[in-house]
């Protein structure tokens, strides 16, 4: 499905804004995996602002689409996307990865609204995604599951097992 030039430009502008917010978050935190964050921003922007069906006011809505950031170290980008979308207050970004913050380098699904799976151990996201998609099929649900993998985790055997499922 091709995007119109107007939609494409709007998404490009939003991704640029989110990259700036990611840079601010890195500055406030004093550290972060900025390369991983920058590399995933276009994908997350398009997923969240164009294709995913979600309700910010109801983050655990049963029929929502799921997003799993397998390369959990890119949480430095995921946090700004979730805050910009309205799941969390943008002020939380100023505490990213600081002692006592709900937002660590690897976002915790039990602490950060909008996170569907806690990730960080490389290679587990695809398996979680396959399980989530299989659950949708078994429950006769229409929600989609989006998984973003990092190239460095593709050597993990669990990815290949998930791919063969």
For the regions a language model picked out, list residue spans one by one:
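N-terminal hydrophobic or amphipathic helices/low-complexity stretches enriched
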Residues: 1-18
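N-terminal glycine-rich anion-binding loops that anchor highly charged ligand groups
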Residues: 17, 35, 39
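N-terminal capping segment at the start of a domain
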Residues: 15-31
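Short coil/turn segments at secondary-structure junctions
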Residues: 2, 6, 27-28, 116
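Cofactor-binding active-site loop characterized by glycine-rich and histidine/acidic residues
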Residues: 25, 38-165
């Amino acid at each position: 499905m091709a995007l119109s030039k107007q939609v494409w430009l709007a998404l490009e502008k939003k991704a640029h804004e989110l990259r700036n917010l990611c840079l601010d978050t890195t500055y406030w935190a004093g550290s972060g995996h900025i390369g991983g964050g920058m590399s995933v921003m276009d994908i997350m922007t398009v997923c969240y602002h164009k294709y995913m069906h979600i309700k910010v006011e109801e983050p655990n809505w049963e029929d929502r689409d799921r997003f799993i950031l397998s390369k959990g170290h890119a949480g430095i980008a995921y946090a700004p996307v979730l805050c910009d979308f309205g799941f969390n207050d943008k002020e939380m970004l100023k505490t990213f990865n600081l002692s006592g913050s709900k937002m660590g380098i690897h976002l915790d699904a039990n602490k950060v609204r909008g996170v569907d799976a806690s990730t960080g151990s490389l290679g587990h996201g695809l398996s979680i995604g396959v399980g989530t998609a299989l659950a949708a099929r078994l429950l006769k649900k229409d929600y989609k599951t989006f998984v973003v993998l990092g190239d460095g985790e593709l050597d993990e055997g669990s990815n290949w097992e998930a791919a063969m499922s």
